[in-house]
Amino acid sequence: MENDKNFSLVDAEKRDILKLYRNDIMKIKAQYRGKVLAIFDQIPGLLSQHEKRVVFKNIQEGSYAEQYSETFFWLSDSMISNECFLCNDPNVGLSINEERTYVKCYMGDTGLLLSHAFDENELLESEVYAQILNDKLSINEGMLYENVIAQMLVANGHKLYFYTHYSREKHRNDIEIDFI
């Protein structure tokens, strides 16, 4: 791939798709709209963190997972995002051990994730792409790779699950498997 490509037209199309997503979100019931927008807007930030799991109290103080179940259903059903739930026992029958209070939220399209992550830099989009192609932009590439894997798994008909193991000795998770 040549490093002098102009990605302005492609990025403009992707930004238009993101605007259409936002317009669609604005059409849903008011009781869900704020939560859906909050999650949608936070997807790039959530994925760029080491701990990618959604922490609901960080969205709104005192909130919890059950208050957002319709939100994730709407985003997933509209194919904007792919949800990934904790599985307490990585064994046969993953859905039996599904814990819906722990969720990761991936974008349904990794190319859109990149534009969504840099949506405040609309005037600099060609510069951003040039820096990416020349390996000069400091971004969390892991979030892109992880999102690609999530997108591929869903495209092949798989539900997304992750696993963590809490160590009582270390007082933290000592094992995490992103996809099982």
Residue ranges and their predicted role:
Residues 1-77:
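Conserved helicase/translocase motor-coupling segment
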